[in-house]
């Protein structure tokens, strides 16, 4: 009896104690707070966020926004939003994502910085559009945001923020231009970005990786380190297989070009720094390549440019030092065409179509003032390998066409641009042209042909206005000089000094301008040689024609200059197919007002002159040779040539 009473008393005591604990107002208040916090976090906050996003977009941004699902874990400090869409009022898309996950860390209290363990955006899509009025849709969106009355100070440090891991997965970027007569749209997808330890804390750097696919199969890769305070980034950037047709779509109304073929590769190590409002950018070991390039004028079949490759290797660019160094440039295997129309306009000048601006308030371009520090440009070696040329000049009275089967060039170049007149030097110039033919436009029969034309050791100094060439050699080839029945020589008419094409006119104008400025161009060619040339001479004013065929023609000229005083040394020799040979050597002044020469004929056949002898005499010339050697001196005086 005593034991049962004692047990009941103990049980009642425990119950009373539990009741006191459970009914403690502080405990009840804590439980109520946790329940309320849970309800606010799990239920009310998602509902508020969904309504706020929708209302804010409609009232402030004048657009449409919606989120299908929002989940908040108030204990883990995570937010998970799915299927967000932001559209313009007419339902055109601006931004969307499949999922946004945020994981906020309480360690922010210890870092004194907002800390996110994870920011993850899945399947985001950004639509950037240039509208019909020329404005960017994002600019209109930015204008819709409420403006702060107090402009922030540019010197104020950014909010303290630390993101331990951020990732964009399977994103897409769509760019559209509706301002041109021919609208264009391209989408870059998939786009993947990853950042680690990204922070606005001073001198805090974190690694990043960016990968994206380009339209048509190209790729973009970008990795390195980044800091947001101060702004700094260093790493590797690469673009592979970028199709030129992608860029052409957005510029086709400004270009008189059909859709181009070709792709671009680019890679570089870079370092970017922004301190005290001054940007620093250095590119090292940069490589650039254009492959299978094909440019064709709209409405034309023949391409203006067709190249297997343009390669630039080991470039160095320094924005602060204002210098660009290119150790190696290679252009190889292809063809370049150019044509001048009747008005003297080069077809390459017509590739850019200028549209008249209808904006009366458009600013008037102001001439830029030279900066104190010029840009320094330098190329170590430029190599052009096996490139054919086609040039047609219809600005002449008789249009001419020049065809070169193969062009090879080696040169070095340097330049200073800005801070005064342009200074540029080309040296170490070597040039070789193969299979050269000059003909009337539209006529495939060459007027003059050369197997090769080679230039050795040339230099061009634009600052000093000087052109110097050590030697020019031409080999083989030939021409025909025909006097027709009317006594006209077509070749002489075609190459008449009075028939000036575009290039010759521009050279003459450049020379006149330089002389007017008191700093004329100087030119010097130490030696010119022609070997193995052939000339067919024919006079059709006689019946039968008088014909001479010259072969193995050798011409040597030395000291060709425009200094106005140095005489030109010449030496020429040839053989005659009909029999005999001849040579002429001596000196002639630059303007031809005096000359001294030695002429030598050995066994020159005069039998081809039979038609002339028959026409003017009653004699018949059956055979004969002439051999002679003489000196000739010529000069002009007031009374005439002597």
Model-predicted segments: where are they?
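Flexible beta-edge/linker motif
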Residues: 71-135, 139, 152-174, 235, ...
């Amino acid at each position: 009896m005593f034991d049962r009473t004692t047990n009941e008393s103990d049980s009642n005591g425990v119950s009373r104690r539990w009741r006191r604990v459970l009914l403690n107002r502080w405990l009840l208040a804590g439980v109520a707070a946790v329940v309320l916090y849970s309800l606010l976090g799990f239920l009310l906050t998602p509902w508020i966020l969904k309504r706020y996003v929708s209302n804010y977009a409609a009232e402030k941004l004048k657009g449409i926004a919606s989120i299908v699902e929002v989940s908040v874990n108030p204990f883990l400090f995570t937010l998970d939003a799915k299927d967000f869409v932001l559209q313009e009022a007419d339902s055109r898309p601006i931004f969307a994502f499949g999922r946004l996950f945020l994981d906020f860390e309480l360690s922010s209290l210890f870092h004194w910085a907002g800390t996110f363990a994870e920011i993850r955006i899945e399947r985001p899509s950004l639509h950037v559009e240039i509208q019909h009025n020329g404005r960017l849709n994002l600019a209109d969106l930015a204008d819709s945001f409420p403006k702060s009355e107090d402009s922030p100070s540019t010197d104020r440090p950014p909010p303290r923020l630390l993101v331990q891991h951020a990732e964009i997965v399977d994103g897409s970027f769509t760019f559209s231009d509706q301002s041109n007569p021919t609208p264009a749209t391209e989408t870059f997808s998939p786009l993947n970005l990853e950042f680690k330890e990204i922070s606005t804390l001073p001198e805090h750097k974190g690694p990043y990786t960016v990968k994206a696919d380009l339209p048509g199969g190209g790729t973009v890769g970008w990795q390195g380190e980044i800091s947001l305070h101060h702004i700094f980034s260093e790493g590797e950037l690469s673009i592979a297989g970028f199709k030129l047709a992608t860029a052409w779509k957005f510029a086709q109304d400004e270009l008189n070009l059909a859709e181009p073929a070709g792709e671009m590769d680019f890679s570089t190590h870079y370092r970017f720094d922004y301190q005290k409002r001054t940007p620093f950018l250095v590119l090292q070991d940069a490589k650039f390549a254009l492959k299978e390039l094909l440019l064709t004028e709209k409405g034309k079949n023949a391409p203006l440019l067709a190249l297997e490759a343009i390669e630039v290797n080991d470039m160095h660019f320094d924005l602060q030092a204002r210098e660009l160094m290119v150790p190696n440039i290679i252009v190889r295997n292809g063809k370049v065409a150019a044509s001048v129309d009747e008005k003297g306009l080069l077809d390459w000048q017509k590739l850019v179509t200028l549209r008249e601006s209808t904006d009366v308030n458009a600013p008037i371009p102001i001439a830029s003032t030279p900066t104190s520090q010029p840009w320094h440009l330098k190329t170590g070696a430029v190599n052009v390998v096996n490139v054919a040329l086609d040039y047609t000049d219809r600005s002449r009275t008789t249009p001419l066409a020049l065809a070169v089967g193969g062009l090879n060039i080696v040169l070095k170049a340097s330049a200073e641009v800005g801070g005064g007149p342009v200074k540029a030097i080309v040296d170490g110039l070597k040039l070789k042209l193969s299979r050269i033919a000059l003909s009337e436009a539209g006529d495939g029969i060459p007027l003059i042909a050369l197997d090769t034309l080679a230039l050795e050791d040339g230099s061009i100094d634009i600052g000093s206005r000087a052109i110097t060439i050590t030697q020019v050699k031409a080999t083989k080839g030939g021409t025909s000089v025909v006097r027709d029945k009317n006594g006209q020589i077509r070749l002489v008419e075609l190459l008449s000094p009075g028939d000036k094409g575009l290039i010759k006119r521009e050279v003459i104008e450049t020379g006149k301008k330089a002389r007017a400025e008191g700093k004329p161009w100087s030119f010097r060619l130490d030696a010119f040689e022609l070997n193995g040339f052939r000339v067919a001479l024919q006079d059709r004013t006689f019946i039968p024609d008088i014909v001479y065929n010259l072969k193995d023609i050798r011409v040597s000229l030395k000291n060709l200059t425009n200094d106005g005083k140095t005489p030109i040394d010449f030496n020429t020799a040839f053989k005659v197919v009909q029999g005999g040979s001849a040579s002429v050597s001596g000196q002639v002044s630059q303007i031809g007002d005096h000359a001294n020469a030695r002429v030598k004929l050995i066994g020159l056949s005069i039998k081809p002159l039979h038609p002339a002898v028959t026409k003017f005499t009653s004699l018949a010339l059956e055979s004969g040779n002439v051999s002679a050697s003489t000196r000739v001196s010529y000069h002009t005086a007031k009374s005439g040539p002597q």
